[in-house]
């Protein structure tokens, strides 16, 4: 487990050991995914130390609900969800390739979690007027929405066109790369409401996300827990879901569409 929060990680490891047995082999490594120097050091060491890597799930930043910048003075969404995750995956790729060549071993999987739209909760002091609170809330929500859309679009398209198309297929790797969005409602998987009648740059990102989420040839919609589905389902190999964007939608009926490529 690689995490910037030590307490959270140790508590999780303790809980897992209590459930599956104290002899469970678990470990924790500190790393700030927005610090690319740390990412290089930590994941290069893991690449050299681990004998194999069958599954890697990247989920940093999915619960971030406010705008902030990282050590490189770029928004932390982009730093974690795009730069940090993809840099780490590139560092681990030689290990994934070695694992894929082990006789009778299943194809390794790399899963990138893309967050649903964050709900922004702003706190204001008692001296702020109602009008000021509304104005600042609208501004903060706008900033949060734009950085979310930009980073999420980068992650989804990066998995499909960056990893699946340009690396896996080009080098004939027996490795699967998937992007998933754990959602709580249909609204999370659908489009964002337009803020006004004027065209804005963020509308382009909104439109791309809308299209990806609704395209039956690109998105897999499942009522199951989508991360677990991406990590364990036999459909990933049977339907060759490499580069797919999997969306967890709460619905009464189970619907499964699989992506195909020319």
Language-model-detected regions and their locations in the chain:
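Alpha-helical membrane-targeting segments
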Residues: 184, 190-219, 257-259
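C-terminal helical subdomain
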Residues: 206-256
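Residue-level detector of solvent-exposed, low-hydrophobicity positions
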Residues: 30, 65, 93, 155, ...
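Short, surface-exposed, charged/polar-biased interaction segments
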Residues: 77, 131, 198-201, 251
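Rossmann-fold NAD(P)H-dependent dehydrogenase/reductase core
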Residues: 1-191
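Short, solvent-exposed polar/charged micro-motifs at secondary-structure junctions
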Residues: 37-41, 253-259
């Amino acid at each position: 487990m690689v995490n910037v929060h030590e307490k959270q990680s140790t508590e999780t490891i303790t809980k897992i050991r209590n459930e599956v047995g104290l002899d469970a082999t678990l470990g924790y490594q500190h790393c700030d995914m927005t610090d690319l120097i740390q990412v290089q050091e930590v994941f290069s060491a893991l690449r050299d130390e681990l004998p194999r890597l069958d599954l890697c799930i990247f989920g940093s930043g999915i619960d971030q609900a406010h705008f902030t910048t990282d050590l490189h003075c770029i928004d932390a969404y982009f730093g974690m969800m795009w730069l940090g995750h993809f840099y780490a995956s590139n560092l681990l790729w030689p290990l994934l390739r070695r694992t894929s060549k082990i006789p009778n071993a299943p194809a390794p999987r790399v899963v990138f979690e893309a967050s649903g739209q964050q709900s922004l909760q702003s706190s204001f002091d008692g001296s702020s007027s109602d009008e000021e609170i509304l104005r600042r809330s609208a501004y903060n929500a706008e900033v949060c929405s734009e950085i979310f859309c930009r980073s999420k679009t980068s992650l989804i398209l990066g998995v499909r066109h960056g990893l699946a198309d340009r690396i896996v297929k080009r080098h004939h790797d027996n490795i699967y790369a998937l992007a998933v969005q754990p959602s709580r409602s249909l609204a999370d998987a659908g489009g964002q409401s337009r803020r006004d009648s004027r065209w804005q740059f963020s509308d382009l990102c909104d439109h791309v996300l809308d299209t990806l989420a609704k395209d039956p040839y690109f998105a897999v919609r499942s009522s199951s827990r989508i991360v677990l589905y991406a990590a364990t389902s036999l459909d990933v190999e049977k339907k060759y879901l490499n580069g797919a964007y999997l969306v967890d939608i709460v619905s009464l009926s189970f619907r499964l569409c699989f992506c195909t490529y020319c």
